[in-house]
């Protein structure tokens, strides 16, 4: 069986995501679509609006055959590391192709770009370190670098999906047998579009409408199972965790904060200075952000603090990856069975005594996530892969 991989977050799953899954199958000719999906904490450092089990269910009912969780150590990361984790798991699963969305309005040869980076990494690094403007954010620096070393590309690092597409291409090119890339142009709504019109809207616009209690506006833009979840489940945001985050920052010593992953350049002092005056998560971010430290960078740091993540813990997961199965259709289950002998990573279907140490960071992340609201179900123990048959 041929498999096409997609790397996703589904925050929440909407009609554009269903189109992506359909296009992945159609353009690649694959029998199976495999989604590597972030768990309860996401790439930009946000808690998911709906828990990972609800989002996996939405995916399985709308064109995805197998949902694998992207471990927290990979999911709450900059684009390059997020891509590194996703590609690693898809390669382990023997996927022949990768389909991803792009915000780019012009045709871009992502595979050629990935090959260029693979062959010119030292030049790229040298150009990056030669930049003199220390106030530029990482995306701004990378845009400047590629305008110098690869001018014909006209890359724009301001678009999140475009950045991810380039990161996928770079990482994919490092493997002996790269996957075939299928970029899909976004249908109607862009990543940052905050308005809803028609049946396709961005996840940003959907979340904004949900938090503004404008659920009727959202319903035409999502499949029925997502609509059901949005109407019956508690919606989660950073404000659910603000008391825990504030307590953690206040009670931690500077030395303890310094031990947190990505706590660099004295950010622990700035956090200590600003935390008492901040009355909400949003206010803390506004007080902390600068041209150099973007909202997203600081939001990821807040997640690392909340989860008490350390560099050693993150690197342990990077070196000891695994495939945690969240759900499958009969096709997805058959594919796992067919490829099991070739898969070099542990395949995990439930949290147990045998794998608790390996999954320790994910378990802790899930426990913290569950603390965000009393209505949230158990996320770790007693949970087995969801099964969905499209014919039922």
Curated annotation (Swiss-Prot):
Listed GO biological process terms: tRNA modification
SUPFAM superfamilies: Nucleotidylyl transferase
GO MF annotation, one: ATP binding
Catalytic activity as recorded in UniProt: cytidine(34) in elongator tRNA(Met) + acetate + ATP = N(4)-acetylcytidine(34) in elongator tRNA(Met) + AMP + diphosphate
Cellular component terms per the entry's GO annotation: cytoplasm
Keyword terms of this UniProt record: ATP-binding, Cytoplasm, Ligase, Nucleotide-binding, RNA-binding, tRNA processing, tRNA-binding
One Pfam family per UniProt: HIGH_NTase1
Main location: cytoplasm
Subcellular location: Cytoplasm
InterPro entries, per database record: Rossmann-like_a/b/a_fold, tRNA(Met)_cyd_acetate_ligase
EC number, UniProt record: 6.3.4.-
Residues annotated for ATP binding in this entry: 7-20, 101, 161, 186
Enzyme class name: ligase
Entry keyword annotation includes Nucleotide-binding: yes
NCBIfam families, per the entry: PRK13670.1
Role of this protein: Catalyzes the formation of N(4)-acetylcytidine (ac(4)C) at the wobble position of elongator tRNA(Met), using acetate and ATP as substrates. First activates an acetate ion to form acetyladenylate (Ac-AMP) and then transfers the acetyl group to tRNA to form ac(4)C34.
Family stated for the protein in its record: Belongs to the TmcAL family.
HAMAP family with a match to the protein in the record: TmcAL
Protein name in the entry: tRNA(Met) cytidine acetate ligase
Organism for this UniProt entry: Enterococcus faecalis (strain ATCC 700802 / V583)
